[in-house]
Amino acid sequence: VPANGDVSAALAGDSPIDRFLAVEMSKHNIQPLPRASREALVRRLSFDLLGIPPTPEEVDDFVADGAPDAWERLVDRMLAAPQYGERWARHWLDIAHYADTHGFERDQRRDHAWRYRDWVIDALNADLPYDSFLQQQVAGDVLAEENPQANSTTDATIAASFLAVGPWDYVGQVETPSPVIKRLARADDLDDMVAQVMTSTCGITIHCARCHHHKLDPIQQEEYYALTAIFSGVKRGDRLVSTEESQRIDSKRNELKGRKLAIDQELNRTRVGISLADIVGGGNGFGTGTLGAGIDASTGAIRKPNDKKGFLDGVVANRLNTTTYPWIDSVFVPDGGTMARLAISQAGAVAQGIPSTDPKVWDAIRNGPVNSQFSTSLDGIECAPPGRSMLSLHANAGITFRLQKEPLEELQKSNAGSTDGGGIVFTAMVGYFGETASKGADVYVLIDDQLVFRYVGLGRNDGLQAIRHELPGGASTLTLIATDGGNGIGHDQICFIDASLAPSHRVESDEEALRVSELRKMSEELHAELASLPEARRVYGVVPEAPSEIRLLHRGNTEDARDVVLPGTVACVGPRMESIAALSSQSSDAQRRIALANWICSPENPLPARVLVNRLWHHHFGTGLVATPSDFGLGGALPSHPELLDWLANELHRGGWSVKRMHRMILLSDAYQRSSVRPESPTAVHSAVVLDAGNRLVWRQNPRRLDAESLRDTMLSVSGSIVHSMHGPGYRDFDYQEEYAPVYQHRVLETPDVFRRSIYRFVVRTTPHPFLTSLDCPNPATMTPVRNTTTTAIQSLATLNNAFVLQQSDRFAMRLQREVGDRAEAQAERAIRLAFGRKPTQTEIANAARLVQSAGLFQLCRILFNTNEFVYVD
């Protein structure tokens, strides 16, 4: 650190930072600007640390606080505020190019990605040491598994999602049948991970070496592929946050389902009737019936039946099969040649209300699953023990029971005097028994042409659902239908357990009636308890697997793979660690990523600490000591104060990698507190402007325009609309239409959820937010260490006419009326104080009041949102 004697007394300050800066200013005979006003300082600090403006009351408190440590206490208070994590998480998420969708042409949602965003917020608020912050994001999930006592398994698993938050080509990696495209998409995926880790942590532009040796930095192409091999066991996808948590919830759910199943079975046994499974099969619903015709998914044409055997013994498509059971005249299985809203049985049942002119749903109406994909066990509970019956329907299958007229009429006559109206009732428990990985199937029950039961998306986790419906007098058909839920999975399997028809009324003893009442109450209570069980938490993140072989790709061509490359790092940076040298082709994913995480955060690696303190400087001064925060190589900028950069990095190490300590050190310096406004006499700073127009010597503070999210949040704050609820899924200010390529259409809404801070926005990669994008909100398809600050006509149009701005202008006006009434002068004074964070002059109040009287309060609010003083921070 330079001694005070090395610089003039006018330049030297108490902070070592100021003494480093003073050395360079002394060389050029530049005098720094004085300290900014207290109003400007509190507003600057609030935006820098919290991303929102201070309230007028907070400004007044600081201005009136004459204690020597007033600024220090203000810094500490804001560093401790929860909004600090929300503000600074935005900077990190820019580097991570975080979003809530995949990107590319399918751009599907990542409904659980938000947990990573919340982890970043919480880690920053907790001042997680920066070395741990990096290590957990590279290898947190596997570090926690190896040492659960030293790591929070939950947090560390979420932290590792850093590797997966970038864009992902679903078509290239999943849907395409082309192995060439798959290899290219996977290579791009690994390149994204390598580039993200190395640029964010070490400021190295490693991806330049994908096709050849790095043109500027001493990085060989082999080293690029050695780093790629580190991540060759990393795939992206949803995963459980905690296996133990999932097991606890599943165990409790299975216990409740088992108890409810036993109760529902006892309830069903209180009724006397006939089993529908006995009618169509050998007592269990299985048989060797001929598979019916299906509908071609692409053309809608009828396909010819094939010879594949199915279930429903003795039942042939498009043929009525007579029975000898009371109440059932015949059974009918359709051939699939008819679709929704068309009759599906000769008995007259009509499939109304089924989502089905879409051939994806009715791509093949058939019966009979593939035996290997079917089990009668659900969540470990056997649903077809001796004495039970099962009636199974393959996905996109239907069966109709035509009811006999005479027995039904006799039954109704015999029960004509009963309180419940008599007749017969259909009861069953229905469950999904197909593949666990499937999203489930849809179930429909129709009586005549009326839909009486529907369950959309019935899956294994839903257990058995009870059905009970009384058949009205004169009912002629009972139809059961299962469809694939629109997912095109034809091996989904639905089973009706103990499906039966029974008299709806019979004489019960008082003891029986009491028992039935008790059973129903117990069943309802268990159903409510099941519904209240939380789902096991999931996060979109790293799905580890056995690492694949990595070969050097000649000129980056995935079809010209050369020698096998072992996992490793770059030789020009960091230590030669034994854990890296010991990696081999047999090393596990955990060994590879842990070795890299330790290499990055080794005290011998000079880059991570320097990269971090430079990013902090960049966000506090507008430009880093190195103007290229993610490129510390020969292609990047030279540091303006290399000794200061080294000293700050050493202080980070010395302070236990505490980020908040580094903030505090910078914010307490004279350099940070300098004015950004030139004095009225230009001669005082003429030499500084001539010699250092870009302010690389930090003789003044840089005025900065609010970034897009901060501008939106500030409008919400000033209008009184902002909702400060933290965490959870992002707000969705768009309409969503599920298609092959989903459609997102942004809207301006009035719900409280969308008035949360912008950090909680659900970010769509392929459909940028129109208002925020016009204000230089970055594209999350790429990493953004430095945001653009452009000045365009569309920005003026957006801040003047965008529906969100008009909405908030109106809410701002309503706030002013609530707080100060209808007097124009009071409204003007309060509006300027809220918007600018300072007391207005009498001239400003008079001019603003005249505008309110002539054009209305709304127009004043709208204009204030468009002033430079509102948009810029001095």
State where each predicted segment sits.
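N-terminal pre-domain segments of enzymes
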Residues: 1-10
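Primarily short, surface-exposed interaction patches in extracytoplasmic proteins
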Residues: 9-43, 48, 52-83, 98-149, ...
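Sequence context surrounding c-type heme c attachment/ligation sites in exported
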Residues: 152-254, 772, 784
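Surface positions of alpha-helical coiled-coils, especially the charged/polar e/g heptad sites
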Residues: 238-241, 245-248, 252, 259, ...
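Gly-Asp-aromatic-enriched flexible segments
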Residues: 265-525
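A structural supersecondary motif
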Residues: 765, 773-783
